[in-house]
Amino acid sequence: MSQDIHAHKILILDFGSQYTQLIARRVREIGVYCEVRAFDMEDQDVIDFDPKGIILAGGPESVPEPGSPRAPEAVFTLGVPVFGICYGMQTMAEQLGGKVQGSEIREFGYAQIRKHEGPALFDDIQDHIANNGVALLDVWMSHGDKVITMPEDFTLMASTDSCPIAAMANEAKKFYGVQFHPEVTHTLQGGRILSRFIVDICGCDTLWTPANIAQDAIERMQEQVGDKKVLLALSGGVDSSVVAALLHKAIGDQLTCVFVDNGLLRLHEGDQVMKMFADNMGVKVIRVDAEDLFLGKLANEADPEKKRKIIGNTFIDVFDTEATKLTDVEFLAQGTIYPDVIESAASKTGKAHVIKSHHNVGGLPEDMQFKLVEPLRELFKDEVRKLGLELGLPYDMVYRHPFPGPGLGVRILGEVKKEYADILRRADAIFIEELRNAGWYEKTSQAFAVFLPVKSVGVVGDGRRYEYVVALRAVETIDFMTARWAHLPYELLEKVSGRIINEIEHISRVTYDVSSKPPATIEWE
């Protein structure tokens, strides 16, 4: 076995903050493994986790309120460095004998804190030097309560006019607390502060790299699977593509992929998947042409939720049929990633951050008699992409925009027909091609075309015609929870519109969606 890339790890306790996963991603980017757990983790579990350091994340609760969340006592007795962020700093202060109270002035957004000399966490880290010689840090605040009395043996690290104790430290025990959020980009020195804590103070080695992750995953898959066979539903999306590349490298011909072409994919996507995996990489891929089956089941159905269920259930039926044809398959591979694992790890008190989980591989039936292989379950999406590059997958495949599970089925409003899908495929391909040519594909988070089954008047030569409408959608977002419409140049939109109308029959009008999320969703259905 190669070196243990989990040997040096950080424990992050979640108190319900929207930023908790962002903290974890920042720690991973530094090159150190970490896990997110609910704040009510048992003391023995904290001890058994054996962290090199602990981060107490933020949260929406109020420390002075009865019954508000507290960190396990083992956090402060284990003898490892502890870093409290926002709520994490407040509960640290309260639990160690300090005092927290509600503030008359709530701080949300940009703030500038005055640094006090001494503690190692901020040593030689600042954004500006004031005229009076005081070092200043530009940070992002989001809090109502504040620490008014520090615990014994703590010293002041930073302050603002409205928050006299903006950061505190117990250097002997290596306990640190900050009232701001170092994990967000608005805190300009946040990365350096986190790195100072994790690498310098906790003493973690930076073992968590794409090359090490790939080698570790390959060895773990070989150990788990042995000489048995593995089945994977290959969709062409990022997660399943990386799983396919990883397992092929680990177990070779023991892997069989089933690629279901449902007739709702992007232009030439089926051929591209086969060329990449079957032809170039030598992966064993069974391609199932199920377009007629899917479109037949979708006939006369206009309700978006019913369309989703039909597409999902039909996929399960097709995959199940193919699976039963294969003999001696013991394992089913899935592209579960770390956010899926976090989302289902609900705290027993219900106060930790819980988002609805989603099922991989279309929600395969529970009665399938396979053992699960989930090689990506420790990784965030950005780590999956980096792993894909490490495994030799092309950049354009690994960093392509998200595509919904039901495919074009939810980008054709109302009933799905082959004619509509063929028109939409071509319009979408033109849009994406021109975005790439203009250098805008990487600037947008998601871009696609939508088919509207309504007819609008157009003029061709001396004649009028009634043809269909296509809408273009492009958004910019960090987390897909909120998004703003992309302000594409008019010249680019004009070129895309002209090509779609001139090159594709039965389109008379192209529109651009200028709705942000909320209130609109990113997809139209």
Swiss-Prot record:
Keywords, ordered alphabetically: ATP-binding, Glutamine amidotransferase, GMP biosynthesis, Ligase, Nucleotide-binding, Purine biosynthesis
Catalytic residues of the enzyme: C86 (nucleophile), H181, E183
Pfam families linked: GATase, GMP_synt_C, NAD_synthase
CDD domains with a match to the protein in the record: GATase1_GMP_Synthase, GMP_synthase_C
Gene Ontology cellular component list: cytosol
Domain GMPS ATP-PPase: 208-400
Positions of the Glutamine amidotransferase type-1 domain: 9-207
Enzyme kind, highest EC tier: ligase
Single GO molecular function: GMP synthase activity
Binding site for ATP: S235, G236, G237, V238, D239, S240, S241
Catalyses which reaction(s): XMP + L-glutamine + ATP + H2O = GMP + L-glutamate + AMP + diphosphate + 2 H(+)
Stored InterPro entries: Class_I_gatase-like, GATASE, GMP_synth_C, GMP_synth_GATase, GMP_synthase, GMPS_ATP_PPase_dom, NAD/GMP_synthase, Rossmann-like_a/b/a_fold
Record-listed E.C. numbers: 6.3.5.2
Pathway where this protein functions: Purine metabolism; GMP biosynthesis; GMP from XMP (L-Gln route): step 1/1
Function: Catalyzes the synthesis of GMP from XMP.
Quaternary context: Homodimer.
Identification of the protein by name: GMP synthase [glutamine-hydrolyzing]
Source organism of this protein record: Marinomonas sp. (strain MWYL1)
